[in-house]
C-alpha cells in the first residue's frame, strides 16, 4: 500500500496504550492491571482492483487521517504521550515491553494498546506489571488486518483511563510494511529490528525504517552465533534514514533497556511534545 500513501524522507526528531470486565483506577504512580475485551474493528478487505481499489484505498487513508487527528486531540486533552512500537513478527516487542514496564511502571502511569490478529497471548504476558492494557484483535477479514489503524486505536481508548496516564505505548501488529502506512495519533514511532532478520532489511522494507524516530536493534545477545554484519546494517540504515536514533538492546539480557527507558522518560519530560508531521 506504500505506493498509495506518500512518505516524506525526513521529519523532526527529538534531540538527544482481555480479560477482566472491569479495572481499578490507578493512584498517582502505579496502575492495577486492567485488561479489557477487544471491540470490533471492522473489515477493510472488501475492495476491488484497479481504479476502484485506488479510490477505496484513498478513502480509507483519508478517513484514517481524520480519526488519527481525533485520537491526537484526545491524547493532548488527557496530557498523555503516545509511542507507536512497530516491528516484524517475532522481533521481541512484547518482551521489550515487559522489561520496560518492570522498570518504569513503579514511577510512571502507563497504558498499553496491544494489537494482534488473534489471541490475547501477548496482552496476557504484560499483566502483573501495573499497566492498564486494552487488547485489539484485528482478525476480521481475510486472515486479519496486518496493522492497527486509527479507528482501531480509537476503539481502545474508552477502555483506558487516559486522563490518569503519563504514557501509552501501542504495540502494533507484527508486520514490516502496513503499520508504517497508518498514523494513529502517536507522538513518536519506535521500530524494533532483530539481528536475526539480516542486515539488508532497511533496503528491502524502507518505509518502516524511514518512518521511525528510533530503531531498536534487538537480540544482540545472539550476535556471537550469527553471521550478521553490523557495519553493513548501519550503512543500509543510513541510506534509508541517516538521522534516525539507534539503540542496541537485548530484551532477554536487559542490555540497552535502561537507555530505551531513558528515551521514553525524556519524551515525558519534554513539555508539549510536538507530534510528527507525516
Predicted regions and their residues:
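Nucleotide-state-sensitive switch-loop elements of NTP-binding domains
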Residues: 47-73, 77-80, 91, 100-186, ...
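Canonical P-loop GTPase G-domain recognition
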Residues: 222-278
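Conserved C-terminal guanine-recognition region of P-loop GTPase G domains, centered on the G4
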Residues: 179-187, 193-244
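G-domain G4 guanine-recognition motif of GTPases
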Residues: 88-89, 113, 117, 194-195, ...
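Extreme N-terminal, non-catalytic leader segments
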Residues: 1-83
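Hydrophobic positions on the alpha1 helix immediately C-terminal to the Walker A/P-loop
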Residues: 96
Amino acid at each position: 500500500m506504500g505506493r498509495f500513501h506518500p512518505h516524506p524522507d525526513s521529519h523532526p526528531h527529538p534531540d538527544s496504550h482481555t480479560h477482566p470486565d472491569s479495572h481499578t483506577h490507578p493512584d498517582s504512580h502505579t496502575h492495577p492491571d486492567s485488561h479489557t475485551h477487544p471491540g470490533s474493528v471492522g473489515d477493510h478487505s472488501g475492495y476491488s482492483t484497479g481504479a476502484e481499489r485506488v479510490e477505496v484505498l484513498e478513502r480509507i487513508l483519508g478517513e484514517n487521517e481524520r480519526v488519527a487527528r481525533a485520537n491526537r486531540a484526545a491524547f493532548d486533552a488527557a496530557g498523555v504521550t503516545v509511542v507507536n512500537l512497530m516491528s516484524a513478527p517475532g522481533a521481541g516487542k512484547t518482551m521489550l515491553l515487559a522489561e520496560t514496564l518492570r522498570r518504569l511502571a513503579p514511577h510512571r502511569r502507563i497504558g498499553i494498546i496491544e494489537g494482534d490478529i488473534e489471541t490475547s497471548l501477548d496482552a496476557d504476558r504484560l499483566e502483573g506489571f501495573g499497566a492498564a492494557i486494552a487488547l485489539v484483535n484485528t482478525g476480521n477479514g481475510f486472515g486479519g488486518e496486518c496493522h492497527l489503524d486509527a479507528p482501531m486505536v480509537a476503539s481502545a481508548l474508552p477502555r483506558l483511563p487516559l486522563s490518569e496516564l503519563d504514557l501509552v505505548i501501542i504495540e502494533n501488529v507484527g508486520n514490516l510494511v502496513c503499520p508504517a502506512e497508518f498514523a494513529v495519533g502517536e507522538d513518536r514511532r519506535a521500530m524494533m529490528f532483530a539481528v536475526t532478520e539480516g542486515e539488508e532489511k532497511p533496503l528491502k522494507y524502507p518505509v518502516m525504517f524511514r518512518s521511525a524516530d528510533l530503531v531498536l536493534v534487538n537480540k544482540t545477545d545472539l550476535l556471537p552465533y550469527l553471521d550478521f554484519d553490523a557495519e553493513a546494517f548501519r550503512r543500509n540504515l543510513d541510506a534509508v534514514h541517516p538521522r534516525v536514533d539507534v539503540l542496541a538492546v537485548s530484551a532477554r539480557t536487559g542490555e540497552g533497556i535502561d537507555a530505551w527507558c531513558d528515551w521514553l522518560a525524556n519524551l515525558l519530560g519534554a513539555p508539549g511534545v510536538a507530534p510528527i508531521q507525516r
